[in-house]
């Protein structure tokens, strides 16, 4: 019996009918707290890694080796005043930051951490994740419009066009995973990657979707970088032009909520990429299967997040027209072509997804 089953049965005996509600709230709270801690130390890891890439130390003053820097940053932002521009629409201005964070947290309801460990094991998990992720664009537009500033509105328009453009390519990538797995349930998608010739010989990582769907995996991940408005696709908040884009009139914790949503979305994109293309909690080799699955999932997410950071430290910012051209003239045609290729592949005698 697993630890979760032991807690579940013990709680059911103790609280009776109220236990399912209490257990659901406890799991949600634990996941939310862990995500917040991950975001705090992801920001520290980003600053450290970029520092090392620039041949410097990065934050090292607050606490041992700078480990308390995220706590200092949070306290600083908590103590800053939220200044609302006179011309801003009061309620919409305050709703926009919250509206960015809620969908970012909500996606975690369907992401499986290991076999049987998921908040909501629903059959339409992939569709749910895609639909909830799409809500973020409305919050960005709302923030730009409610500020009643032409610079914020320009940033919001850029963000909306960019996010919608790359969502189409990401959608096609998810359609291909659906075609090969035959299910929208994320746990079943992970399970579908645990079979095949290579998995039968103990080399599990060659059975994962990244290999047969390599171009789509690359497109999905790069589109994820664009979707989160991260460098080199950060024309939304180009420092040399409109500074913080749609966030330019925000301060204090309202400003921090936008950054919180951005970093949670980075982790979400990495978690979905690991689940859909990298076998989720599956170990790369059969002889390593004794290690808990959540370790492998976290390791894959960490590796993908490090690629996010590496891209920020390495590539120059794209121009707006280059971003649009890449999305519409490169990624979209490749995705459509790959849908046709995989369709014929699955109907041929060489179908590897049987």
UniProtKB/Swiss-Prot annotation:
General function of this protein: NDH-1 shuttles electrons from NADH, via FMN and iron-sulfur (Fe-S) centers, to quinones in the respiratory chain. The immediate electron acceptor for the enzyme in this species is believed to be ubiquinone. Couples the redox reaction to proton translocation (for every two electrons transferred, four hydrogen ions are translocated across the cytoplasmic membrane), and thus conserves the redox energy in a proton gradient. This subunit may bind ubiquinone.
TM region(s), chain numbering: 25-45, 91-111, 126-146, 170-190, 205-225, 253-273, 290-310, 330-350
Main location: membrane
EC number: 7.1.1.-
Family: Belongs to the complex I subunit 1 family.
GO cellular component: plasma membrane
Catalysed conversion reaction: a quinone + NADH + 5 H(+)(in) = a quinol + NAD(+) + 4 H(+)(out)
Top-level taxon of the source organism: Bacteria
Subunit-level organization: NDH-1 is composed of 14 different subunits. Subunits NuoA, H, J, K, L, M, N constitute the membrane sector of the complex.
A Pfam family annotated for this UniProt entry: NADHdh
Record key words, sorted: Cell inner membrane, Cell membrane, Membrane, NAD, Quinone, Translocase, Transmembrane, Transmembrane helix, Ubiquinone
Signal recorded as keyword: no
NCBIfam families: PRK06076.1-2, PRK06076.1-3
Localisation: Cell inner membrane
PROSITE patterns according to UniProt: COMPLEX1_ND1_2
Enzyme's top EC category: translocase
UniProt-recorded name of the protein: NADH-quinone oxidoreductase subunit H
Gene Ontology biological-process annotations: aerobic respiration
GO molecular function: NADH dehydrogenase activity; oxidoreductase activity, acting on NAD(P)H, quinone or similar compound as acceptor; quinone binding
InterPro entries linked: NADH_UbQ_OxRdtase_su1/FPO (IPR001694), NADH_UbQ_OxRdtase_su1_CS (IPR018086)
Membrane topology: Multi-pass membrane protein
């Amino acid at each position: 019996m697993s630890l979760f089953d032991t807690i579940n049965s013990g709680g059911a005996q103790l609280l009776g009918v109220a236990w399912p509600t209490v257990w659901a709230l406890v799991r949600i709270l634990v996941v939310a707290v862990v995500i917040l801690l991950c975001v705090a130390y992801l920001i520290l890891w980003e600053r450290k890694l970029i520092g090392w890439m620039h041949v410097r130390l990065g934050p090292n003053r607050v606490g041992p080796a700078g480990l308390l820097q995220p706590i200092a940053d949070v306290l600083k932002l908590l103590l800053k005043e939220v200044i609302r521009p006179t011309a801003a629409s009061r309620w919409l201005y305050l709703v926009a930051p919250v509206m960015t964070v809620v969908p970012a947290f909500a996606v975690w309801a369907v992401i499986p951490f290991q076999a049987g460990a998921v908040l909501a094991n629903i059959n339409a998990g992939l569709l749910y994740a895609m639909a909830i992720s799409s809500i973020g664009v409305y919050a960005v537009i709302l923030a730009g419009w409610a500020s009643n500033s032409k610079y914020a509105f320009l940033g919001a328009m850029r963000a909306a066009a960019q996010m919608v453009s790359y969502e189409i390519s990401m959608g096609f990538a998810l359609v291909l995973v659906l075609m090969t797995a035959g299910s929208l349930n994320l746990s079943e998608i992970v399970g579908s990657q645990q079979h095949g010739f290579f998995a039968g010989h103990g080399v599990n990582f060659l059975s994962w979707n990244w290999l047969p769907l390599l171009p789509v995996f690359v497109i999905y991940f790069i589109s994820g970088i664009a979707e989160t408005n991260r460098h080199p696709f950060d024309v939304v908040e180009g420092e040399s032009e409109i500074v913080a884009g749609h966030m330019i009139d925000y301060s204090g914790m309202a400003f921090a909520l936008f950054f919180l949503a951005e970093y949670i979305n980075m982790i979400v994109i990495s978690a979905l990429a690991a689940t859909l293309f990298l076998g989720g909690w599956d170990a790369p080799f059969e002889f390593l299967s004794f290690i808990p699955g959540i370790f492998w999932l976290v390791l894959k997410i960490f590796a993908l997040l490090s690629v996010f950071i590496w891209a920020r430290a390495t590539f120059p910012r794209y121009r707006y027209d280059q971003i649009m051209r890449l999305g519409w003239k490169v990624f979209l045609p490749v995705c459509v072509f790959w849908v046709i290729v995989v369709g014929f592949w699955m109907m041929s005698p060489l179908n590897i997804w049987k």
